[in-house]
Amino acid sequence: MDFLNYAFMQRALLAAVLVGITAPAVGIYLVQRRQALMGDGIGHVAMTGVGLGFLLSWSPVWMATAVSVVGAVTMELIRWYGKTRGDIALAMLFYGGMAGGVMFINLAPGGSNANLTSYLFGSLSTVSESDVTAICLLAAFVVVVTLGLRRQLFAVSQDEEFARVTGLPVRALNLLTAITAAVTVTVAMRVVGLLLVSALMVVPVAAAQQLSRSFAATFAIAVAIGVTVTTGGTVTSYYQDVPPGATIVLLTIGAFIALSVLAAPLARRRARALAAAQPAGDPAECAIPATRAAGDEVGV
């Protein structure tokens, strides 16, 4: 535990815990909306914000947040009103964001692509006190939104038409989800890196779904996995001198594989128990449900 004696490791671990909480908390809604790659798109757009921050001598974290929010809102507007296919528009934001980041950081006084590396792949030693303050504020916003509006966000993510019929402001909630995802990307970029943050938003959720189909349980398990792999990856990167972002993502994928292997026999045992409990010849076995509830895929 000697790493706790160093201030930079204390800051890095605090940031890692916040990232482990916020990334899966937002990712569960993106997975339900089948927008798992949205984090990648926002991460590329955030590069432009980082480059602008260096160019204008402003905080790269806050500038990346502002640019990411604009990019996320633009993605939603294109999805609603654009005549260009959604995947083409997303690709343009991908490459435009990356090109803008490289260009701006090279135009900055004394700037070079090396300055961008810690934001692309994460860095423990460069997490400053101001970064931690910004991360704490942004993480608080993400937690309030994802927990406070969990029922509304789940309804919209699961079935927009059903949510609209019940009177929910679907477009406003979609925009809020996109903005929250953008904020989460900037929260995670100092620890995981912009190019790898999407994995931490998606893979813990996919791993949690191997164990549970309930929304609440999936949410809790995904956050637990997120915190475990981010703190474990941060400590491992300190002792082994390896990139923290890559370490965290590899641990996350390892957790997914391990839970998938463990979940298979559990699923078979559950199926056998259900079959044994079901009376032979019960008409319910052949019954066709009349309606599809909004929570059929992942129970609330």
Model-derived features: where do they sit?
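Membrane-interfacial amphipathic/re-entrant helices at transmembrane-helix boundaries
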Residues: M1-I21
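Transmembrane helix-bundle core of multi-pass membrane transporters
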Residues: Y6-R11, L90-L149, I179
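Loop-to-transmembrane alpha-helix initiation sites
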Residues: A12-A15, P60-A66, D87-A91, I135-C136, ...
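Short loop segments and helix-boundary regions at transmembrane helix junctions
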Residues: I28-G111, A208-A220, S237-Q240, A264
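Small-residue-rich segments of transmembrane alpha-helices in multi-pass membrane proteins
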Residues: V45-S57, L93-F104, T126, V170-L175, ...
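Helix-loop-helix "hairpin" substructures at the membrane interface of multi-pass membrane proteins
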Residues: S128-P204
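Transmembrane alpha-helical segments in multi-pass inner-membrane proteins
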Residues: V191, L195-A246
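Cytosolic-side transmembrane-helix boundaries in multi-pass membrane proteins
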Residues: V242-V300
